[in-house]
């Protein structure tokens, strides 16, 4: 029993601490140890003598109502508040949330020789004055003379006139060659003016042969149209259209003759 009481008191001493023994001692009530009452069913043995124990202080008070709330003064022996050490702040650790700002903005609260977790501070370029910035930013304007401008305008107009003349001269030469060439189908009398829709051109030889066929027969059969088209190097449709137009022309001439004659 004495061993268990000694262990319990040692356990309580380790929890409470040795620095505030006086404070904790005043809080608890000192009382004599009373032997627990034996149950009624247990019979005393006459062979063994009764044991007497020395009185000792109770571990816990008789009632829980006497326990008071701990104060800050009583706990000062266990809890030690953190005190900022000024001799370590300049050389070892710097607040990490200020490091990104310290690279670009100079803070007055830091020592100039303090390290920022191995980061290198970028040196800002020297500040330029307004006059120097204005001189560097102003673009250089090239100088032009009136003579140079007039010469360039004259050259541009000459080039335009020359290109227009060349473009108009080429079709004129082509038209003259077409009119002088007798074998050209566009130069014959069937070809209409440029203002009207151009008809299918026929050569003189083709027109003479078609006129001969028309004198023999005003209406050609299908087989004869294919034969004439093969001889004159034309299509069957061209021969058919020419005969239709020739018949319309002949009817018109007959109406004019009948109208003139009384």
Swiss-Prot record:
Task: Give the highest taxon in the source lineage.
Answer: Eukaryota
Q: Can you say where in the cell this protein is located?
A: Nucleus
- Annotated function: Sequence-specific transcription factor which is part of a developmental regulatory system that provides cells with specific positional identities on the anterior-posterior axis.
User: In Gene Ontology terms, what is a biological process of this protein?
Assistant: proximal/distal pattern formation
Question: Residue ranges of the DNA-binding region?
Answer: 195-254
Name this protein carries in UniProt: Homeobox protein Hox-D9a
Kindly give the InterPro entries that the UniProt entry links to this protein. Answer: Abd-B_homeobox_TF (IPR050803), HD (IPR001356), HD_metazoa (IPR020479), Homeobox_CS (IPR017970), Homeodomain-like_sf (IPR009057), Hox9_activation_N (IPR006711), HXA9/HXB9/HXC9 (IPR017112)
Q: Which GO terms describe its molecular function?
A: DNA-binding transcription factor activity; DNA-binding transcription factor activity, RNA polymerase II-specific; RNA polymerase II cis-regulatory region sequence-specific DNA binding
Please tell me whether the keyword Transcription regulation is annotated for this protein.
yes
Q: Cite the SUPFAM superfamilies for this sequence.
A: Homeodomain-like
